[in-house]
Amino acid sequence: MKYYWQLSVFYLFYFGSLGALIPYWGLYLHTLGFDANAIGELMAIILVTKMVAPNIWGWIADHTGKHILLVRFSSILTVVFFAGILIDQSYSWLVIILFLFSFFWNAALPQFEAITFNLLGKQPHQYGMIRMWGSVGFIITVALFGWLFQHISITLLPILLIGLFSCIWLTSLLIPEQATTNLSVSTESFYQIITRPTVIVLFISCFLMQLSHGPYYTFYSIYLEDNDYSRHMIGSLWALGVVAEIGVFLIMQQLFTRFATNNLFTLSLAITALRWLLIGYYIESLPIIIFAQLLNAASFGLYHAVAMQIIRQNFSDQHQGKAQALYGSVSFGAGGAIGSLISGYTWEIYGALVNYLWAAVICIIAVLISWKWMDKT
């Protein structure tokens, strides 16, 4: 398809930055001397802005049609504001910088997802082949940085991230603005679509799914390090999980052909509940932890691909920017932020096991909701 590599390389660097941020930011803050409460709060800031920023940018993009220009604008400001971390590392300064940086960083991806589906047109099944490169970027950085931080100080993480954020901006220049003209217009308003029962159930389930990821995204690396896993091994385990999700992206077209989307979505939630139980109870068993990481094929790969498919089925190009923004803000934003805060406040008091238990329970609730009320499609 046209623009395949231009789209793919953006995902490569965007999720490459995510592969540096999610596994190692908690360790970086831990090295600076912050306790679990502070780490949870600082991680939550990045997710809180995801509740607001994407919706603002999504509304602007859909009403102006300037999706790629907004991606470029938000990407360059991401670099500018994140560079402020080099000035000071106090808690109050980090709060300000993380808020400003993430307000723009979180704005770019939903609009780029809308651009991707716009360009795919009648070939949405090719999304997995493009999004796969984001997973490749995640693997490269998480594995490379895991090895790197065995030899250099993790306090250099911000400098490395600035380089990755700069690459995001550069790759956004590869897509011409005229390539992203809307293809279809809906006769229904955005409000009418989001009040459909299936859409409501989707967003509730996505919120719960990302809520359950709180202990994982915030403390998984610290949890592993506390149980004598090396940073190289920590990076390898993160990378393994993403390798598994790539496998799912490669076969999504066949899965959509053979199985109903609602069944695939519910299955991803159920497998995620099992994954949290395995991590909580068997952290000292490397074979079980390896198996648990392979389950990321379902807890992110399958889950995200099916969610994208349902959104594409329900929202026209006219509303894709707002739809992608709402998906990000409700799930990764609200769900992720609340999950991060809960795990931050309970980690030192109740320990890892309790955190992964409540995460599993949340997933089971999501299973019941999606199984009972999501349309059989």
Segments the model singles out, each with a brief description of its role:
Residues 1, 172-206:
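Juxtamembrane intracellular "pre-TM" segments in multi-pass secondary transporters
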Residues 1-47, 199-237:
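Helix-loop boundary and gating motifs at the non-cytosolic
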Residues 12, 81-82, 91-109, 207, ...:
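Hydrophobic core of transmembrane alpha-helices in multi-pass small-molecule transporters
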Residues 29-30, 60-61, 132, 147-152, ...:
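Interfacial helix-cap and linker-helix signal at transmembrane-aqueous boundaries
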Residues 52-66, 149-150, 248-261, 347:
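Helix-to-loop junctions at the C-terminal end of transmembrane segments
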Residues 69-83, 263-278:
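Structural signature of the two symmetry-related core transmembrane helices
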Residues 99-133:
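Cytoplasmic helix-loop-helix junction between adjacent transmembrane helices
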Residues 147-163, 344-363:
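A membrane-interface helix-boundary motif in multi-pass transporters
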